[in-house]
Curated annotation (Swiss-Prot):
Its main location: cytoplasm. InterPro entries: ATPase_NBD, Gcp-like_dom, KAE1/TsaD, Peptidase_M22_CS, TsaD. Fe cation binds at residues 111, 115, 300. The keyword Lipid biosynthesis does not apply. CDD domains: ASKHA_NBD_TsaD_bac. This is tRNA N6-adenosine threonylcarbamoyltransferase. It holds the Pfam family TsaD. One of its GO terms (cellular component) is cytoplasm. Its EC number is 2.3.1.234.
Amino acid sequence: MRVLGIETSCDETGIAVYDDKLGLLSHALYSQVKLHADYGGVVPELASRDHVRKIVPLIRQALKNADTKIADLDGIAYTKGPGLIGALLVGACVGRSLAFAWNKPAIGVHHMEGHLLAPMLEEDAPEFPFVALLVSGGHSMLVKVDGIGLYEVLGESVDDAAGEAFDKTAKLMGLDYPGGPRLAKLAATGVPAGYQFPRPMTDRPGLDFSFSGLKTFTANTIAAEPDDEQTRANIARAFEEAVVDTLAIKCRRALKLTGYNRLVIAGGVSANTRLRATLAEVMTSIGGKVYYPRGEFCTDNGAMIAYAGLQRLKAGQREDLAVKGQPRWPLDTLPPLF
């Protein structure tokens, strides 16, 4: 089976072609970072309009690079949610329209299921079951995964997600958009300076996350300290360590609760070097293994949507012709594949 994947949930237009026998044949991505940089964050209306401009040329490019004709496709997968509703509808409209015009089955894919399954695109792919840490700009969650669609959300963010906390803290430090990667780069030049940053919600039972208080603590620290480059780097390091430690503590708890020894980390924050190193140490200490996608598939992309959609189309799942987007969509409501 060969599937065209379309991702437009936020500010990246991602298109890919995936074949269940040959693997990933092509993927094309357009990032809107420069478009939104002047505003310090994603402007939903601008994001939607840019998807409209870029999506068709990218589809043509992906099909050409995959040496794939319309007749070679067996289905179309597009991101149905969660995400920005205007951006979602661009991908949904194009995906459903092409499916109708080409007489192909189509399916709307859950964006976070795409991230969760992104490590399956690698040669060293995890086997079920495992615990997944999904960390992005909009989500932070721990999920018990026993198969595709067999998900139990063990904990999630009650306010700011980890990626959102990175971006907001970067803005407090005067760093340009996108702030998360820039903060991590600044933190790499920092040194331990005795800051006592909290590890939110680790002093109580449970697996939920909260990062809004940590952001406020950082803001107060910035205001009280000298405004020089090294001090900012030291604060950035302390903040990053606090976020990573918090995620690691919660992962240990989730692994102990489930008894699993495989951990998947995915989503934009999974590209963070300190997070990867820390979780690798955690898994080594318990005789387990950590899995994550390559850097280009940590952020939003069409490859993960094509892969996830192919699994569901191959299992016989189909949707009607209605164009639908779901800005909010609980992961654990997805039907399982047996």
